[in-house]
């Protein structure tokens, strides 16, 4: 059972976010600073022990945010788990390789790029000064971040060093750096050359353009019910779509899945629950998120409900960390379409448990779940062999 305070504490309004400009060693490099680093779910890979974190609870993945002025660059670095960039505002040039050549691809609002582990990557703001990307990192323990040799050299030239135990030593702030300290050894050119090379054509398969999303109006059991009408578009991994022909453009393991959900004005997603933890980021519109405190069975009436309103606009995007296995529903509280990004823990397919009254109402509309957990015509499903 959840308390009202527990439920409310998981709401992350955009205006509550706090950043640091000194999360990483590149803060001292002029072309890389300022860079505003946010940690929403988990600490991410920040090398600053004072990094503000909105919610430290483990989810199986981590959610962060990044913003920096036009023309600023995040230099070459590498991760050991998935890193997903979700562009919510502006235009960005994504870079990868540094092996030694650099490949680039531009992304815009609503686009998602997932960069494979064990390759160097960076990015540059080529749009508005307040451009913003959310980020998803695979796993609770990511293994940290490994900077490219050129990044460590540029920082050292500014008097800022990274020790082999990942402590930042800033001589400009009066900290001492001497021969007794051991600097982090970067990869050698030979080691970098041994990393996999991803061509622009290969990386393009890992960019999911917002304009090319595969929306389905049959992805949820309740979609055809009066006052519902939600559509779902998969991005990566096995999500909660109940459309049997849905397949995400990116299918390899990340530790989480990503989908978009679109609610028409006045629409909703009816009462349901998932076994997995899920993070919702409101991209556009006003969405009421209703969460129940009691973990009752599907036949029970709704229990005590906490209602939160999440808003998404070019000025900011509210988030909510949905607890596992709790009853919830989503309602479009605005007079325009609402868009929400869903990040759900786990590589396995997610299975929705619908409230009993939703299942009955769907049956009246000749909709039911087949033996494989997909939406189909009830009059056929009822004829299936026991």
Residue ranges and their predicted role:
Residues 1-59, 163-254, 374-386:
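A short, N-terminal "cap"/entry segment at the start of jelly-roll beta-barrel domains
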Residues 51-56, 74-79, 96, 104-105, ...:
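Short histidine-centered beta-strand/loop micro-motifs
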Residues 44-51, 62-79, 257-275, 293-296, ...:
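Conserved short histidine dyad/triad with adjacent acidic residue
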């Amino acid at each position: 059972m959840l308390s009202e305070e527990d439920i409310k504490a998981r709401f992350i309004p955009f205006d509550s976010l706090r950043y640091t400009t000194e999360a990483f060693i590149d803060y001292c490099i002029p072309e890389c600073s300022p860079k505003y680093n946010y940690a929403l779910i988990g600490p991410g890979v920040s090398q600053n022990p004072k990094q503000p974190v909105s919610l430290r609870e483990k989810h199986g993945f981590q959610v962060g945010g990044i913003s920096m002025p036009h023309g600023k660059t995040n230099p070459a670095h590498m991760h050991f788990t998935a890193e997903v960039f979700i562009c919510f505002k502006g235009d960005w040039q994504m870079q990868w390789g540094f092996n030694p050549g650099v490949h680039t691809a531009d992304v815009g609002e609503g686009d998602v790029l997932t960069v494979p582990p064990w390759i160097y990557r960076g990015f540059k703001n080529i749009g508005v000064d307040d451009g913003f990307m959310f980020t998803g990192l695979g796993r609770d323990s990511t293994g940290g971040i490994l900077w490219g040799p050129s990044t460590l050299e540029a920082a050292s030239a500014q008097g800022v060093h990274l020790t082999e135990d990942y402590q930042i030593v800033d001589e400009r702030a009066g900290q001492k750096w001497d021969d007794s300290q051991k600097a982090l050894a970067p990869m050698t050119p030979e080691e970098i050359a041994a990393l996999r090379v991803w061509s622009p054509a290969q990386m393009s398969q890992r960019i999911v353009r917002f304009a090319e999303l595969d929306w389905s109006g049959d992805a949820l059991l309740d979609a055809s019910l009066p006052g519902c009408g939600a559509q779902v578009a998969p991005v990566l991994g096995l999500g909660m779509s109940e459309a049997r022909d849905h397949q995400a453009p990116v299918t390899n393991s990340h530790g989480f899945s990503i989908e978009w959900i679109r609610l028409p004005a006045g629409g909703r997603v009816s009462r349901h629950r998932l076994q997995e933890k899920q993070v919702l980021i409101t991209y556009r519109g006003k969405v009421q998120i209703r969460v129940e405190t009691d973990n009752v069975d599907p036949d029970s009436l709704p229990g005590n409900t906490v209602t939160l309103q999440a808003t998404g606009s070019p000025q900011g995007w509210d988030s909510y960390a949905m607890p596992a296995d709790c009853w919830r529903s989503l309602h479009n509280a605005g007079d325009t379409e609402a868009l929400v990004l869903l990040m759900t823990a786990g590589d396995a397919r997610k299975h929705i448990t619908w409230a009993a009254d939703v299942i009955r109402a769907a049956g009246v509309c000749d909709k039911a779940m087949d033996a494989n957990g997909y939406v189909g015509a009830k009059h056929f499903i009822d004829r299936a062999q026991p």
